[in-house]
A protein has these predicted regions:
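Short secondary-structure boundary segments
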Residues: 60, 122-125, 149, 239, ...
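Structured C-terminal subdomain patch of bacterial secreted/periplasmic proteins
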Residues: 155-164, 170, 258-323
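Bacterial Sec-exported substrate-binding components of ABC uptake systems
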Residues: 1-64, 170-207, 317-323
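A short, structured surface patch at a secondary-structure boundary
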Residues: 55-113, 117, 122-126, 235
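Alpha-helical, coiled-coil/dimerization segments enriched in small aliphatic residues
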Residues: 83-85, 216-244
């Protein structure tokens, strides 16, 4: 049986003090909240928080779920951009947060929420052309954080998930919640690895999207580590990107045993399967020939709180005999 049990948000939140930005305001009464001031470097931006932010906006689902996993819904004044359904454990909390836009909000809509902190999941959340760059926000007195999967660095993995949760927990004054979540997440991954002991890895091609080319998971993103820990071998691990394009000729040459389909957006899993099955050029690819498909929601395969549980979910599909 695979492990997945999202940490339920705490019922009682630590009281939030004055808003933090750059420059940060002073805490109430001049006394620092426990754990503050807190200085963190994130994707090249260093910020000192004098107190937990109290008017946060999240853009992109996986960072929204980080906040909800830590019981921080009362710190949210807005959210935007879902890829798929919010986890059931977080739905009630999510429904209480104003949705600023179906995708990214305009600069005007974002500023109208009067945030003191903006948390983006992808670099596109901080689009300079749309007036939402981190520098733009800083000039407006708003602190920001970018999910570390999109920082210019090396390959990311589950340790980066734990660090992301820890840093967000510290930023909002709830480090104990972050530590509790991480302990549970690590235990689940360990349990999956134990039951896979002795199984031979299967070769995996991730099909995210694409027609003329295949948009796939490369070796730098967390999706690559999820495959490895779930008992697979990413056939495009040599692609030096989180996501990137591969030719269909490369897919054929690398002969994947299983195709993992990322589920999101308006194109359904069945439509993606049909595109692969109907392509005569892919007919002899083992995964296509044997109709071996696995499915993960996109939100499972990015750097967020779903990633540790996704190891077990994917392992069940790659190695059903080891369930």
């Amino acid at each position: 049986m695979s492990w997945y049990r999202p940490l339920l948000p705490a019922a009682v939140l630590i009281p939030l003090l004055a808003a933090c930005s750059a420059p940060a305001s002073d805490p109430v009464g001049g006394k620092a909240a426990p754990g503050f001031p807190y200085t963190v470097s994130n994707c090249g931006v260093t910020t000192t928080y004098q107190a937990p932010p109290k008017r946060a906006v999240t853009m992109n689902q996986h960072v929204t779920e980080v906040m909800l996993a830590l019981g921080l819904q009362k710190s949210l004044v807005g959210t935007a951009y879902l890829d798929d359904a919010v986890l059931p454990a977080y739905k009630k909390a999510y429904d209480a947060v104003p949705v600023l836009a179906k995708e990214y909000p305009s600069k005007e809509a974002l500023l109208a929420a009067n945030p003191d902190f903006v948390y983006g999941g992808y670099a596109s959340a901080f689009d300079a052309k749309a007036g939402r760059s981190r520098d733009d926000l800083k000039r407006s007195g708003i602190a920001s954080r970018l999910n570390t999967e999109y920082c210019p660095s090396g390959a990311t993995g589950l340790d980066d998930v734990y660090r992301e949760v820890d840093e967000v927990g510290r930023t909002f004054g709830v480090p104990d919640r972050a530590a509790a979540w991480t302990r549970e997440a690590r235990a689940g991954v360990t349990a999956t690895e134990k039951r896979l002991k002795g199984t031979a890895p299967v070769s995996v091609f991730v099909y995210d999207s694409g027609d003329k080319t295949a948009f796939t998971a490369g070796g730098k993103g967390i999706g690559n580590e999820l495959i490895t820990r779930a008992g697979g071998r990413n056939v495009f691990a040599d692609l030096d990107k989180t996501f990137g394009d591969a030719t269909w000729e490369q897919v054929v040459a690398r002969k994947p045993d299983v195709i993992v389909i990322y589920d999101y957006g308006s194109t359904t899993v069945e439509q993606k399967k049909r595109r692969l099955l109907d392509d005569p050029a892919l007919r002899e690819v083992p995964a296509v020939k044997n109709r071996r498909f696995a499915v993960l929601p996109l939100s499972d395969a990015v750097l967020g709180v779903r990633a540790p549980g996704a190891v077990g979910k994917l392992a069940d599909q790659l190695h059903p005999a080891a369930r």
